[in-house]
From Swiss-Prot:
<keyword id="KW-0539">Nucleus</keyword>
<dbReference type="GO" id="GO:0009617">
    <property type="term" value="P:response to bacterium"/>
</dbReference>
<dbReference type="GO" id="GO:0010150">
    <property type="term" value="P:leaf senescence"/>
</dbReference>
<feature type="region of interest" description="Disordered">
    <location>
        <begin position="1"/>
        <end position="65"/>
    </location>
</feature>
<comment type="function">
    <text>Regulates senescence either by modulating WRKY53 or by activating SAG12. Affects the natural variation of cyst nematodes sex ratio and susceptibility to parasitic nematodes, depending on single nucleotide polymorphism (SNPs) between cultivars.</text>
</comment>
<dbReference type="Pfam" id="PF04520">
    <property type="entry name" value="Senescence_reg"/>
</dbReference>
<comment type="similarity">
    <text>Belongs to the senescence regulator S40 family.</text>
</comment>
<dbReference type="GO" id="GO:0009646">
    <property type="term" value="P:response to absence of light"/>
</dbReference>
<protein>
    <recommendedName>
        <fullName>Protein S40-3</fullName>
    </recommendedName>
</protein>
<dbReference type="GO" id="GO:0009737">
    <property type="term" value="P:response to abscisic acid"/>
</dbReference>
<dbReference type="GO" id="GO:0010468">
    <property type="term" value="P:regulation of gene expression"/>
</dbReference>
<feature type="compositionally biased region" description="Basic and acidic residues">
    <location>
        <begin position="16"/>
        <end position="41"/>
    </location>
</feature>
<dbReference type="InterPro" id="IPR007608">
    <property type="entry name" value="Senescence_reg_S40"/>
</dbReference>
<keyword id="KW-0611">Plant defense</keyword>
<dbReference type="GO" id="GO:0009751">
    <property type="term" value="P:response to salicylic acid"/>
</dbReference>
<dbReference type="GO" id="GO:0005634">
    <property type="term" value="C:nucleus"/>
</dbReference>
<dbReference type="GO" id="GO:0061062">
    <property type="term" value="P:regulation of nematode larval development"/>
</dbReference>
């Protein structure tokens, strides 16, 4: 007659704990030294915040993530120029903007 075992008896048997405990106690010094070397080498993991993920729902449909990212990127951009204006050029551009917005009359 064969003996039936419970799953916990096979996986969590007392022998496996004693074997692991013996290995750890014998190699305790080597284990600690390896962990400190590994800590120095490894870099921290960046975990993104959950608040940055936002989905907009229109008529029950979900917006694809690439569309959301594109919207964020374009909304965050400002108009800028690569060249810096100085002196007379800066005055001309300032006056042009003020005329276009109605703050300066022609």
């Amino acid at each position: 007659m064969s003996e039936e075992f419970q799953e916990s008896e096979v996986i969590f048997s007392d022998e496996s704990f004693t074997r692991k405990d013996n290995k750890i106690s014998h190699n305790n010094e080597n284990y600690e030294r390896k962990s400190t070397e590994k800590d120095k080498i490894s870099s921290p993991v960046r975990i993104p915040s959950r608040t940055t993920i936002r989905y907009t729902e229109e008529e029950g449909e979900m917006t694809p993530p690439h569309v959301i990212i594109e919207k964020r990127r374009t909304e965050a951009q400002m108009a800028f120029s690569f060249c810096t204006l100085k002196g007379r050029d800066l005055s001309r551009h300032r006056n042009t903007v003020l005329r276009m917005t109605g703050f300066l009359e022609v």
